[in-house]
């Protein structure tokens, strides 16, 4: 298929475009769903120098942060925002983040996006693994993209793909190259992520990745519901035990609510495809997160039902691993390896549900998958953490 391409950033050729506005007219395309891509350099506070790419197609607007590993800040569909309200209000430039701060929790100083990639040398909670001190959720999210490109199909329906390359390289440690592709098709309330991890080094390496996908109001509200086809669900730690019976229901915001995390072993179809759905109390707004269990075999549900100011949010997080520190997950078989010059693909999709019929259809698909297996609620965490 023939495509139009526009390179935005290319570190190898010292090329970078700023403050531009492209439209379908820029490519000589006439279409029923006009599109545009706008670039901004942000100013002030810790967002000084951060960059924002805003892609609009029809009634969908997606904001990307190339300075922060092409994170998706939020998505707006027909006036409904999908994302969440963090106490971190700025789009923080990684130059101002010390990931070693707060006992390895410095990553949280920039955490406010809808889609955050955690990895790739490690993901999960901070702590010592062997002789290494691992910070929260790895380093990729605080790495700017080295290459960014817009691609538009010449032929209808003129699918749009925003691609980026983010490198995770450290002498004697890793030589990872991550290609990130996000595609949208006109007329669909859906975006599709296809990422590729490549080990450019000469040695086999461990890797981990978690897609930390986060949703707040209006999709999240009291009386809302999670629908996740699962073989088993267990509490992450002792605190989460008290919420196990209601792991899939949404309570109102509550001051003093500490995060509750649940480990899920999902059910998939014969091709490995599965979906998790979150919808509001009226079941007329929601989101369906699709992924493949051959690539991302486990799911973490993160419930942070704190006050709206502090962060009223639920995470639907498919990954190669749970959120435990890497040292605990080898025994679970959840620290995969990638050989020299090998690659791994990860596919994640987001379908934005805008009415009762769309919500009901996605929930029915989940129920159909669950019908094949009896869900087990396991009382004990998979890992015994130090008190």
Language model feature labels by segment:
Residues 264:
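Flexible, substrate/cofactor-facing loop regions flanked by secondary structure
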Residues 212:
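Histidine-centered active-site/metal-ligand motif
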Residues 258:
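Mid-to-C-terminal polyanion-binding domains and interfaces
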Residues 1-192, 204, 215-252, 267-387:
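Surface-exposed acidic/polar loop and edge beta-strand patches at domain peripheries
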């Amino acid at each position: 298929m023939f495509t139009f391409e526009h390179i935005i950033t290319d570190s190898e050729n010292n090329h970078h475009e700023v403050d531009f506005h492209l439209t379908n007219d820029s490519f000589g395309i006439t279409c029923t769903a006009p599109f545009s891509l706008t670039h901004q350099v942000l100013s002030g506070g810790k967002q000084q120098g951060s960059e924002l790419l805003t892609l609009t197609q029809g009634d969908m607007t997606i904001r990307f942060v190339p300075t922060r590993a092409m994170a998706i800040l939020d998505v707006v569909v027909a006036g409904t925002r999908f994302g969440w309200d963090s106490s971190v209000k700025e789009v923080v430039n990684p130059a101002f983040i010390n990931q070693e701060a707060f006992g390895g929790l410095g990553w949280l100083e920039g955490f406010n996006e809808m889609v955050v990639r955690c990895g790739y040398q490690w993901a999960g909670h901070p702590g010592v693994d062997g002789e290494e001190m691992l910070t929260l959720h790895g380093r990729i999210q605080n790495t700017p993209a080295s290459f960014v490109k817009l691609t538009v199909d010449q032929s209808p329906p003129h699918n749009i793909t925003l691609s980026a390359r983010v490198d995770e390289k450290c002498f004697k440690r890793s030589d990872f190259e991550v290609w990130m592709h996000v595609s949208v098709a006109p007329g669909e309330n859906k975006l599709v992520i296809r990422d590729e991890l490549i080990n450019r080094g000469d040695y086999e390496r461990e890797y981990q990745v978690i897609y930390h996908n986060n949703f707040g109001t209006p999709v999240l509200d009291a009386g809302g519901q999670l629908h996740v086809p699962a073989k088993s669900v267990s509490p992450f730690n002792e605190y989460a035990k008290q919420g196990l019976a209601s792991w899939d229901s949404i309570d109102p915001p509550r001051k003093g609510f500490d995060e509750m995390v649940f480990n899920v072993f999902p059910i998939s179809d014969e091709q490995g495809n599965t979906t998790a759905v979150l919808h509001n109390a009226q079941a007329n707004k929601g989101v369906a997160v699709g992924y493949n269990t051959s690539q991302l075999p486990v799911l973490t549900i993160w419930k942070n039902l704190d006050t709206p100011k502090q962060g009223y949010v639920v995470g639907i997080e498919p990954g190669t691993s749970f959120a435990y520190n890497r040292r605990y997950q080898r025994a679970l078989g959840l620290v995969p390896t990638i050989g020299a010059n090998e690659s791994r693909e990860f596919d994640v999709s987001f379908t934005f549900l805008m009415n009762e019929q769309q919500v009901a259809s996605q929930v029915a698909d989940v129920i159909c998958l669950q019908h094949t297996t009896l869900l087990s609620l396991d009382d004990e965490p998979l890992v015994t953490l130090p008190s």
